[in-house]
């Protein structure tokens, strides 16, 4: 964390579970994909607010490893929307100094979509103002397993002793290993769970739940979440008195 203007404490890394697209559409008697399309506007709004506030990293849970279980026509529509959004939004991201990273297991995606992911990442690779991470075919359990497998290969190859494996080493092998841990995790749609998202990384994150469906979570809602975060005291196992005595930011 760091102090920003007017001594408002802003999270370095915000993670969001974008929930409620289907229910938003159903409420309006629209097909589910209409909710996902409307959700793109909310993504734009949240990026704007976070970048303006001084957030460094925004990670969005776009498609979980469990979402493949949804109806085939819905999954197909989501993949098409993802492809279109990547190609349409990459120029604007680049113009605004935003770097895009896709995290998750890409092997199950169509080669055309995988290529679009690589192209979008390459087009924005030099940007440093803000990092947008999109979690696609991602699961927190998968992330921990692939990190453990990387360490196991190091041990098997004689490059690492098993007793030298630490929490820090494992964390560094996660797909977000080179980024600060999330300070704030937001979930929209009224549900109160993290649904296999960034399981390791969210260990000390502040959780914020909104009843708004994702397409309705825009500028004002994002600012409200950041304002709520700035009022919290993050203790990391210490007492309030210890935190206050250290005279560090209360978030």
UniProtKB/Swiss-Prot annotation:
Binding site for substrate: 20-24, 36, 64-66, 68, 70, 187, 193-195
SUPFAM superfamilies: Undecaprenyl diphosphate synthase
Active site (catalytic residues): 19, 67
Matching InterPro entries: UPP_synth-like (IPR001441), UPP_synth-like_CS (IPR018520), UPP_synth-like_sf (IPR036424)
GO terms under biological process: cell wall organization; peptidoglycan biosynthetic process; polyprenol biosynthetic process; regulation of cell shape
A GO CC annotation given for this chain: cytosol
Cofactor: Mg(2+)
Lineage: superkingdom: Bacteria
Keyword Metal-binding belongs to the record: yes
EC number: 2.5.1.31
Manner of cofactor binding, per the entry note: Binds 2 magnesium ions per subunit.
UniProt KW keywords: Cell shape, Cell wall biogenesis/degradation, Magnesium, Metal-binding, Peptidoglycan synthesis, Transferase
Keyword check for Magnesium: yes
Record field: catalytic activity: 8 isopentenyl diphosphate + (2E,6E)-farnesyl diphosphate = di-trans,octa-cis-undecaprenyl diphosphate + 8 diphosphate
Matches recorded under Pfam families: Prenyltransf
MF (Gene Ontology): ditrans,polycis-undecaprenyl-diphosphate synthase [(2E,6E)-farnesyl-diphosphate specific] activity; magnesium ion binding
Family label: Belongs to the UPP synthase family.
Function: Catalyzes the sequential condensation of isopentenyl diphosphate (IPP) with (2E,6E)-farnesyl diphosphate (E,E-FPP) to yield (2Z,6Z,10Z,14Z,18Z,22Z,26Z,30Z,34E,38E)-undecaprenyl diphosphate (di-trans,octa-cis-UPP). UPP is the precursor of glycosyl carrier lipid in the biosynthesis of bacterial cell wall polysaccharide components such as peptidoglycan and lipopolysaccharide.
Subunit relationships: Homodimer.
HAMAP family: ISPT
Protein name per its UniProtKB record: Ditrans,polycis-undecaprenyl-diphosphate synthase ((2E,6E)-farnesyl-diphosphate specific)
Annotated organism of origin: Pseudomonas aeruginosa (strain ATCC 15692 / DSM 22644 / CIP 104116 / JCM 14847 / LMG 12228 / 1C / PRS 101 / PAO1)
